[in-house]
Amino acid sequence: YNVDARRVYVAGLSAGGAMAAIMGATYPDLYAAVGIHSGLPYASARDMASALAAMRGHRTAAATPLPSVPTIVFHGDRDTTVHHRNGEYGIAGAELRSETGEAGGRAFTRTVHQGRSSLEHWLLHGAGHAWSGGDAAGSYTDPAGPDATREMLRFFAIA
């Protein structure tokens, strides 16, 4: 296959989102951008006990480093599996600007790194532990809300 090595992306939901964060942080020369939906940020846990604490919203690492590759994060504020604070921890320390809106019948707050478009955080109001804008026939998908797939593809195109 003739793959453009400059246009390789990784994305995932929940543990897959955490793995996407790890892959982007560990191999920044391989991935052009990362998409995380309802997952833990890089370096938020070091073992099972700290992972479970992080999933409950407790910050277990002294500081989560800002992503070194462009990263877009989605998280529902009613997620009872992985607390939504994890999405915020993944961009803590960045200078941010926020906007609110509604898509697919669900309100959201979108936060973008000030001065560059390499970090985006979407807090989905009323959403749980499911892929936003997904097909109702799927598992861990929520047809309500912004289309996370479409927004990740938009973000990847400008990353």
Label each PLM-derived region with a short phrase.
Residues 41-117, 123-128:
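The feature captures the conserved acid-bearing segment of alpha/beta-hydrolase catalytic domains
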Residues 14, 25, 81-85, 142-147:
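Soluble non-cytosolic domains of exported or imported proteins
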